[in-house]
Amino acid sequence: MRDETPERPAPLRFGYTTGSCATATSLAAARLLLTGRADDAVEIVLPKGQRVMMRLEFCRATADGAEAGTIKDAGDDPDVTHGALIFARVALGGARGVRFHAGPGVGTVTRAGLALPIGEPAINPVPRQMMTTHLDALAAEQGYTGGFDVTIGVEGGEALALKTMNPRLGIVGGLSILGTTGIVRPFSCSAYIASIHQGIDVARANGVAHIAACTGNASEDAMRAHYGLPDIALIEMGDFAGAVLKHLRRAPVARLSMCGGFGKLSKLAAGHLDLHSRHSSIDLPLLAQWARDAGASDALQAAIRAANTSVEALALAGADGVPLGDVVCAHALRVARDIVPASVAVEMFAIDRQGRFVGSAR
């Protein structure tokens, strides 16, 4: 019997992206410079037109401009930046327009394939546009015809970035300033999926023809050892097999290896593209049916249906000489091939909990 989903007394809270935080703090700092007014909260307009008020931790003058900071509130989303101080330092001068700089804790792009050129601060296009729109409006309101130099920072961002995919993507020195809507939707996993897409794009842009999409550290280690692939070719897909397969329709590579634990691969084989236990479960009767197709006896089929886990089912099949790992990989391969272009050579690998291969198909 499945565990019951715990009840929550209230709906999950939405939060705000680092891009929204950067917009609010840069606007507050610029307003202080142009009007002398130091706000303790600031209203911004999100990309879809919503107006939100964001609290500030500080807004103050500095020797060469002004700075403002806010605490990132990701709502009920388990975001790595939740609770971090996001700040902006703004200086006036130069030609009209906004020039962006990476402050402490914000990374710099060092590889091709991302939405920004090499050498640029890792402040994504939508947050840049949000800041530019607000600062241009402020300049027009105040009759200011010069430019803005905006430096965005994240307190502790360099350490936080080690918990993200930024180092593998070639974003060094800190975090990225992200967001397309300005809002963090709880458990939407949009940032994780975006990092999967970026990983594929970076690999392609750097001439990598063979990528390996892996569910976790053990499968990454297995692929690295098996093929000698560099880190740039290893895509940490987690539970999001569909994010990899669907992105390859738009951005194909020559060869894709997918590797995961036997249980995860059995979910993909059954047609599930989100392998998390919240969204898909292991189908033991289906495993028994596939074992039958591979020659399993009635007794083995019954034992698989009654197994406590997929690992037990695999062990039972192996003891009877039934290659259930290969069978599962073959079904997973069919699912993948129905999604990716025919030009992509696909192969599947299943591993056990010790990282040993227990099945493959190509």
Curated annotation (Swiss-Prot):
UniProt-listed InterPro entries: CbiD, CbiD_sf
GO biological process: anaerobic cobalamin biosynthetic process; methylation
EC number(s) from the headed UniProt entry: 2.1.1.195
EC class: transferase
Keyword S-adenosyl-L-methionine included in the entry's annotation: yes
Pfam families: CbiD
Highest taxon in the source lineage: Bacteria
Single GO MF descriptor: cobalt-precorrin-5B C1-methyltransferase activity
Pathway where it operates: Cofactor biosynthesis; adenosylcobalamin biosynthesis; cob(II)yrinate a,c-diamide from sirohydrochlorin (anaerobic route): step 6/10
Keywords per UniProt: Cobalamin biosynthesis, Methyltransferase, S-adenosyl-L-methionine, Transferase
Reactions mediated catalytically: Co-precorrin-5B + S-adenosyl-L-methionine = Co-precorrin-6A + S-adenosyl-L-homocysteine
Family under the similarity heading: Belongs to the CbiD family.
HAMAP family given in the database record: CbiD
Protein name stated in the entry: Cobalt-precorrin-5B C(1)-methyltransferase
UniProt source species: Burkholderia multivorans (strain ATCC 17616 / 249)
